[in-house]
């Protein structure tokens, strides 16, 4: 059973993707690592209107693609670990324990916990501090997915992280990731930020793009396929933490040198 680690990095996160690959190798847990970047994406994906917003890097459309692409090349039963390049990897013993869970489950997804104060309102006073999905999904996405649910209880569940995902290659998981990719590819309107004229509910805080789509899908499948949903342990510092969502942007060697020379200049000047 192969264990493969992947990440993606482009533009500001290119150096971070190189750094996290070295962290992954140093853990001596993964049999293979792969770093994707923009040039690895197919032209059909690059032509998506989601890539017109350079600030959001394609609204993370590349994420389900790189996961599906890697899964497609693995054998049945192999394990794929995806992490955002801004994260930091640690604790090899903790990784061994976490991956043991895949003996009985086909995937591990991480949800924001009801018992932690994420202080979302510090970023924007209009944001609700609750991680419930109803606050983090625009109306058009809610309305699109609602018909497949029996009621609206799924919106009272917490949103999932899309920054760390652990998946075993099985037919069910290939189906789920392909559907995630298809929704983001063929319905970019459900992924992008709501337009100014689109009315949102009073409880709406912000639309979370790839995370919102993934959350809706996994909340539908959680009692239909063999997956595990756990409270995340990557935000802030925790004992036995295996991933920290530090959102780290590593400087290139060139920028590090520029910063160093700039600091020397100011010391001499003063």
Located regions from the model:
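Glycosyltransferase catalytic domains, chiefly GT-A lineage
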Residues: 1-270
């Amino acid at each position: 059973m192969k264990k493969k680690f992947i990440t993606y990095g482009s533009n500001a996160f290119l150096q971070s993707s190189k750094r996290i690959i070295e962290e992954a190798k140093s853990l001596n847990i993964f049999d293979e690592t792969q770093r994707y970047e923009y040039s690895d994406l197919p032209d059909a994906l690059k032509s998506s209107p989601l890539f017109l917003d350079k600030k959001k890097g394609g609204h993370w459309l590349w994420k389900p693609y790189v996961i599906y692409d890697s899964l497609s090349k693995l054998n049945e039963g192999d394990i794929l670990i995806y992490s955002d390049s801004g994260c930091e990897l640690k604790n090899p013993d903790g990784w061994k324990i976490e991956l043991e869970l895949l003996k009985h489950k086909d995937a591990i997804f991480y949800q924001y916990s009801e018992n932690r104060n994420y202080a979302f309102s510090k970023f924007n006073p209009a944001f609700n501090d609750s991680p419930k999905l109803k606050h983090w999904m625009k109306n058009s996405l809610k309305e699109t997915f609602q018909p497949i649910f029996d009621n609206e209880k799924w919106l009272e569940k917490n949103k999932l992280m899309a920054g760390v995902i652990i998946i075993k290659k099985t037919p069910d998981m290939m189906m789920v990731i392909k559907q995630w990719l298809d929704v983001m590819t063929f319905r970019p309107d459900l992924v992008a930020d709501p337009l100014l004229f689109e009315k949102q509910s009073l409880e709406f805080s912000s639309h979370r793009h790839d995370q919102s789509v993934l959350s809706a899908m996994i909340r539908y499948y959680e009692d239909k396929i063999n997956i595990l949903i756990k409270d995340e342990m990557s935000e802030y510092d925790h004992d036995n933490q295996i991933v920290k969502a530090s959102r780290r942007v590593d400087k290139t060697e060139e920028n590090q040198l520029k910063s160093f020379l700039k600091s020397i200049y100011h010391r001499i000047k003063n």
